[in-house]
Amino acid sequence: DRDSCVDKSRCAKYGHYQECTDCCKKYGHNGGTCMFFKCKCA
C-alpha cells in the first residue's frame, strides 16, 4: 500500500525525505517521496 507510511513518517519542509524513504523500504517499497508534507511510497 503506497500510503503505509503517510501517518507513520513526517515529512520535513525542505527535502529531508530520509525518514519517509526508510519507512517505505521497511514496508517493501523501493523508497518514498514527500508530497504536500505526506509520505508517499514508490
Swiss-Prot record:
Which positions, given as ranges, span the membrane?
none
Annotated keywords = Disulfide bond, Ion channel impairing toxin, Knottin, Neurotoxin, Potassium channel impairing toxin, Secreted, Toxin, Voltage-gated potassium channel impairing toxin
Task: Spell out the InterPro entries in the cross-references.
Answer: Ergtoxin (IPR012622), Scorpion_toxin-like_sf (IPR036574)
Q: List the disulfide bonds.
A: 5-23, 11-34, 20-39, 24-41
Q: Which domain of life is it from?
A: Eukaryota
GO molecular-function annotation terms? potassium channel inhibitor activity; toxin activity
Compartments where found: Secreted
UniProt-listed SUPFAM superfamilies? Scorpion toxin-like
Pfam families according to UniProt: Toxin_17
Tissue expression summary? Expressed by the venom gland.
A cellular component annotation (GO) from this entry: extracellular region
Q: What is known of its domains?
A: The presence of a 'disulfide through disulfide knot' structurally defines this protein as a knottin.
Job description of the protein = Blocks Kv11/ERG potassium channels.
User: What protein family is recorded?
Assistant: Belongs to the ergtoxin family. Gamma-KTx 1 subfamily.
Question: Know the name of this protein?
Answer: Potassium channel toxin gamma-KTx 1.3
Q: Which species is this UniProt entry from?
A: Centruroides gracilis (Slenderbrown scorpion)
